Amino acid sequence: ILRIVAFIGACKGTDVKKLLKYVFYTTMAGCLLLMALSAAGIYGRLALEADFGRGYTQVRYCFGLGHPNALHCMFMMLVLLGLYLYNEKMKWYAYVILFAMNHALYLLTDSNTGMLITFCGIFGGGVIHYWKGLKGKKWIYLAGAVVFLLCVGFSVLAAESRFAEPDYVIYQFRNPLVAEVESHLNGRIRDLYYGSIRCEGTTATWSLFSEPGNHYYFDMGFVRVFYWYGIVPGLVYVILNIWLIWRFYKNKDGMGLVMLVVLSVYTVVEAHLISVYIGRNYLLFLMGMYAAVMPGLCSGNEEEGYIWSVPIVFLKLKK
């Protein structure tokens, strides 16, 4: 948590757009290098042949990134970051090219989640670009906040055994909603209940703050937030994302909203953003960019404040 706070604080007062361009090009160069080394047989596996939980063996390409889902995930992150940086300058054919690249990569990775989220991100970027005035409408930001809260809410409910109603005899769920969603998530929810002795990740293993023993890895990202860091930091994380959506609205940052919403849906299924490698969560850069303008932290000629200085605001109000 301290690393994340320091990371956000380091972004304060910097040209985050310029920083994100550096992140974009260095990440893309690194991924292309890994793919080239893998294709040449020098480093990393080109493809994996296994049963990926679908009941049959298949060959899926990863090009040195370890797993097909990871390959499509990195493509998705680069597309979203590229759209955030250059969406306003893009022509219609650029979206067509991105759609085609996404489909071509899907033929190699067969990563359903990565393909669908990337598709939604490209489509959302196109809508923001061509629907003039949409990024200034309050309702789209309210809708984005609702989607984010639904993603968090479902993740919490899925981790609660009294809601999910796991059946430890047949390894299924008696709750029809959870059972139906799990049939499309390829074992993500099942892993919480049947993947470890203590049912790591379920609400029974959560604590108010982080515990040294809570270090188990699983895919569901929002569940990992509360399991790894604790309930209180998890709630702070939720509040910060809602605040970030509000800042998107105030700054008419439509592409920022698209990025946050599609990544929220992705984080229900995957934990790419909830990782010890905090630099790959591009939303943290945006939190840092907007942190200095937290309501009440600066006014007129007052010294600029940090987002974690909120308690000072309440002390000022009492005076």
Language model: regions and residue ranges:
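Hydrophobic transmembrane helix bundles of membrane-integrated enzymes that assemble
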Residues: I1-D167, M220-I312
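Charged/polar, solvent-exposed surface patches and flexible loops
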Residues: K21, Y171, Y194-I197, R247
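Extended, basic/helix-rich recognition subdomains
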Residues: P166-V169, I189
